[in-house]
């Protein structure tokens, strides 16, 4: 029997070790401890960053939101039915990014930027981070250019400027989305790109909106981002940030963009759900402590940036142009309670609010804008000259009318001045009514306001105001097309335009064709 030599054995082992090819890969990996309700707890991820993407087996991704001493709480983006305890999870070193660029115009995408409209892949697009820091004060420029919504009541009394944040607030089924969609439709030929973010809505509702945008030709310059009611809370929470990043692409390159968040109440509810599942301590109305920051960091990204900012961002490729991102966030109230937690937060963040009232809506005044409570803090400087000049008495007339109407119910005999104010207020209220999907041009709006301001409606029956306005606009667009085109292009108000409008209305009233 041959005896084994220990020194030979050790030499063989050493040789084997020397020849062994081990290509080591340094990576931060952990183990899934629990999976429930779209939340995953992971043990062993030592170097993970807040908001970092975490990769699970089967190309499932999550986002780290809770960094604790011995574990990490992450929220899953998408389906998580393939995940189980004991699976591995590894850091990617990247934060969440979504596709951006003009290739997205006319498309419907989910919160992660994946197309869901059946029109094929997006093609070559850039990507950008979902969470970004808003431009600093030095890089901003004051708001002095208008965004025409096409609504008389808004453009005359609560004007919106490029780079402004104007809240649309009111109860459910009162016309908030209709107002925002009309504002998007009105940008069809204005050169403003639009982003519509639908959060927690029914898919059928979103499909109807997309169809309407397509019919009116507004979808071609609009991006629709959808996180419907059937999507996870994580995607509903992320959708507004993703839409904002897509809008910032235009702002940072010297273009103008408009973004509608429909609505931020549902985003706050989704974030509350995530926070409670992550075992964060609840605060008022069970919302987490940072729900104000949730909305402030989103809405601060809407701004008007200076020429220097655009030039610096594009490395000198674009010069002498300012960029803007205008935000129209929507908040749904419960029984008109604007003093609830989320509504008061968003009111304090934004530059004004358009308050829609149930009582007005139910009485047939649509859009149901309450002129007394609605305000635009910075839009006045951006208002078109002719609209600004002619709308001065409109808000006063409406406010006085509402006050006097309540008083007149108790008074039997009214003096002449009060009666005239009531009659004028009735006609102005009727004039402010407008059909859905029928945004008005500057000239059409100026004509209506001129007729009200200069007393041309006094002898028109209240019930005939609507048909009078339609006939008047049709008459001017047919017989005074040059004057209307001039108003639309310049938006100025001078003696020549004043005389032209006056003569035209007098000529129209003489025909009695309404």
Curated annotation (Swiss-Prot):
InterPro entries, per database record: ATP_synth_asu-like_sf, ATP_synth_asu_C, ATP_synth_asu_C_sf, ATP_synth_F1_a_nt-bd_dom, ATP_synth_F1_asu, ATPase_a/bsu_AS, ATPase_F1/V1/A1_a/bsu_N, ATPase_F1/V1/A1_a/bsu_N_sf
Molecular functions per Gene Ontology: ADP binding; ATP binding; proton-transporting ATP synthase activity, rotational mechanism
Binding locations of ATP: 170-177
EC number of the protein: 7.1.2.2
SUPFAM superfamilies given in the database record: C-terminal domain of alpha and beta subunits of F1 ATP synthase (SSF47917), N-terminal domain of alpha and beta subunits of F1 ATP synthase (SSF50615), P-loop containing nucleoside triphosphate hydrolases (SSF52540)
PROSITE patterns: ATPASE_ALPHA_BETA
UniProtKB keywords: ATP synthesis, ATP-binding, Cell inner membrane, Cell membrane, CF(1), Hydrogen ion transport, Ion transport, Membrane, Nucleotide-binding, Translocase, Transport
Function: Produces ATP from ADP in the presence of a proton gradient across the membrane. The alpha chain is a regulatory subunit.
UniProt family annotation: Belongs to the ATPase alpha/beta chains family.
Protein name per its UniProtKB record: ATP synthase subunit alpha
Organism: Pseudomonas putida (strain ATCC 47054 / DSM 6125 / CFBP 8728 / NCIMB 11950 / KT2440)
């Amino acid at each position: 029997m041959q005896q084994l030599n220990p020194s030979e054995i050790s030499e063989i082992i050493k040789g084997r070790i020397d020849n062994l090819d081990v290509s080591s890969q340094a990576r931060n990996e952990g183990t899934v401890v629990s999976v429930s309700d779209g939340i995953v707890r992971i043990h062993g991820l030592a170097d993970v960053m807040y908001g970092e993407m975490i990769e699970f087996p089967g190309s499932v991704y999550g986002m780290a939101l809770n960094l604790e001493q011995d574990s990490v709480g992450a929220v899953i983006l998408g389906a998580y039915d393939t995940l189980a305890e004991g699976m591995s999870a590894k850091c990617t070193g990247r934060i969440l990014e979504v596709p951006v660029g003009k290739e997205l115009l006319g498309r419907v995408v989910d919160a992660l930027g994946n197309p869901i409209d059946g029109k094929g892949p997006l093609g070559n697009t850039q990507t950008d981070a979902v969470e970004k820091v808003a431009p600093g004060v030095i890089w901003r420029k004051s708001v002095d250019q208008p965004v025409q919504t096409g609504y008389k009541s808004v453009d005359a009394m609560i004007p919106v400027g490029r780079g402004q944040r104007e809240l649309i607030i009111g109860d459910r089924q009162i016309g908030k989305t209709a107002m925002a969609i009309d504002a998007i439709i009105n940008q069809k030929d204005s050169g403003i790109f639009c982003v519509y973010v639908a959060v927690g809505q029914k898919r059928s509702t979103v499909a109807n909106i997309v169809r309407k945008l397509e019919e009116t030709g507004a979808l071609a310059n609009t991006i629709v981002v959808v996180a419907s009611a059937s999507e996870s809370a994580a995607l509903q929470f992320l959708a507004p940030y993703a839409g904002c990043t897509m809008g910032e692409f235009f702002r940072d390159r010297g273009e103008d963009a408009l973004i509608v968040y429909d609505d931020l109440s549902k985003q706050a509810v989704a974030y509350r759900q995530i926070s409670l599942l992550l075992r964060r301590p609840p605060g008022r109305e069970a919302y987490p402590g940072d729900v104000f920051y949730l909305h402030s960091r989103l809405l601060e990204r809407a701004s008007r940036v200076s020429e220097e900012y655009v030039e610096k961002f594009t490395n000198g490729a674009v010069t002498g142009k300012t960029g803007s991102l205008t935000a129209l966030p929507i908040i749904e109230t419960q029984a008109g309670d604007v003093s609830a937690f989320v509504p008061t937060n968003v009111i304090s963040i934004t530059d004004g609010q358009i308050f829609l009232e149930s009582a007005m809506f139910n009485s047939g005044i649509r859009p149901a804008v309450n002129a007394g409570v609605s305000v635009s803090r910075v839009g006045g400087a951006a208002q078109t000259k002719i609209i600004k000049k002619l709308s001065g008495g409109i808000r006063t007339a409406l406010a006085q009318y509402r006050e006097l109407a309540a008083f007149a119910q108790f008074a039997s005999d009214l003096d002449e001045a009060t009666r005239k104010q009531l009659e004028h207020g009735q006609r102005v209220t009727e004039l402010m009514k407008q059909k859905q999907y029928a945004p008005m041009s500057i000239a059409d709006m100026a004509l209506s306001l001129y007729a009200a301001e200069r007393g041309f409606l006094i002898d028109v029956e209240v019930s005939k105001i609507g048909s009078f306005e339609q006939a008047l606009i049709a008459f001017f667009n047919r017989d005074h097309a040059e004057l209307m085109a001039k108003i639309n292009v310049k938006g100025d108000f001078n003696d020549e335009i004043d005389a032209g409008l006056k003569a035209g209305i007098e000529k129209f009233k003489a025909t009695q064709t309404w």
